[in-house]
Each structure stands twice: as C-alpha cells, then as structure tokens.
Amino acid sequence: MREAQRLIDKGRLICDGEVISEKNALLSGEICLIEYETNPRGLKPIFECDKFAVFDKPSGVLSHPNGRHCEYSLNDEIWSLYGREASVAHRLDCETSGLIVVGKDKNAVVNLKKLFENRQVYKSYVALAHGKISENLRIEANMDLANDYDDVKMRMRICEDGKSAVTEILPLEYFADIDATLVRAVPLTGRQHQIRLHLFYVEHKILGEPLYGLARPQIENILDKEMSEIERILTTGARRLLLHSDEICFKFDGVEYKIKSKFDAKDEFYKLVKHG
C-alpha cells in the first residue's frame, strides 16, 4: 500500500490514460505504471567506496525527479551508475550546489540517513551574503513551515513555537565593490532552508535567494522559470542561489571520512555577481 501511495505521489500510475491523484480511489480499466529511463549526462562522483559515493551537484539539478516531466535529475546519474537501490542520503535544494552523499544499496542508504538524522555528520557551506559581516555569528531562531494560506508552499518562517535551529556563520572575505561577504555557514541542526532563512533573518540575505524577501508573484515567476535571467539578477543579485555545500565529515563503518568540494566558490560566486 505504501509503495502504491508513493507511486501516486510521483504521478507514475495511470488509469485509462489519466494520471491517478486520489490515493483511495478504486481503480478499474487499463492501469499502467510509468517506468523511468535514465538519462545520464556524465556527471561522476568526486569520491566513492564500496558502500557510498559523493557527488558535487551543480546548481539547478534536482536530487530526485519531481514528476513525469522532469528531464534530468541526479537520480539519472545515480541509477545509471549503481542501479535502482541506490539513493541520496540527505537533501540539497535544487539551486544549492555542492556535496551530496549517495548510498549504493538499501542498507547503506538506511545507515547513512540515520547519520544525518542523528546529527552525526558535520556539514559546512559557503555562501555569498549581502552586506558586511565583520564577526562570527551564532544564529538561534526556531523555524517551521509558513502556515499562511497565501504563502508559498515550500517557504519556512521564524517562529517561537517552531523547531530548534542553530547556525554558525564565519565571515571569510568582504568584497566592498559588490557589498557582499563570503561566509562559511555551519548548520548545527538540519532544518529545511535553515542557512537561507537564518541569514535573511539577520538581514544578510544570500545573493540570488529566490524565496525569502520577495513578493509571491516574483517567487512564482522564478520557480516557474518565467523570469528572465536579467530580471532575476536585478531582483535577487545573482542568476542562481549563491550557496554551496563545501565540506562534509562523518564516520561510517568505523572509518572517518572528510570530503571537500572541488568547486571554487569564492571565485565563481564573485564572478556571478560582478559580471552576471
């Protein structure tokens, strides 16, 4: 039953030519299951062992396909290389680039996910934030899903009765010509959009931010890819979210792993803001 519900959520069950959306519907007629064919583009892991691999995900690539019309996701590379038992072990937003861990079989996926859920993984991100940040920050602000009916479904909010969320921010370099600070962000908890919302909360929004600090029509235009690249730059400061998963450390099967991204976030982020 759970597998059938999962397939319905993903739009992969069809009855007499119509996509099934009602989970409790009684079905009769010709029922089809849509099977995905992988569409790899040659992205290779930067590290792998027998049980897992680590990819440096480009910005704009989904970790999982989000429906029948998704042309490409990291899943295409994962299944092509390791088969359909392989899966990502944690989240990484579509526009966030950087390190993402992939279990090669069901057992590895389960055990890796437990490490992330139990906060046994050190994660470090690099971001380019608006304004000058001169000293280390420790941001403690509870978070939850935005509950306003008119709000964007995926957006989070700061609220006293939300879940505990703590982020440490370390300034690395200030660029006066673009009034932005390159920072290292270390989330001590694992809330959705945590770094993004916390930096917005302390008035140092990440450049390129498509959700926080924008009006609903602007957000929808960005998410629906109806906003031009020039307008996106003028609206948010960059044509993509300037947040990168840079370093990850954990212990797995008795071995300590410390994996660093090969992406030069400082140079690339500066060029994206300075030259578009």
Describe every region a protein language model picked out.
Residues M1-G276:
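RNA pseudouridine synthases
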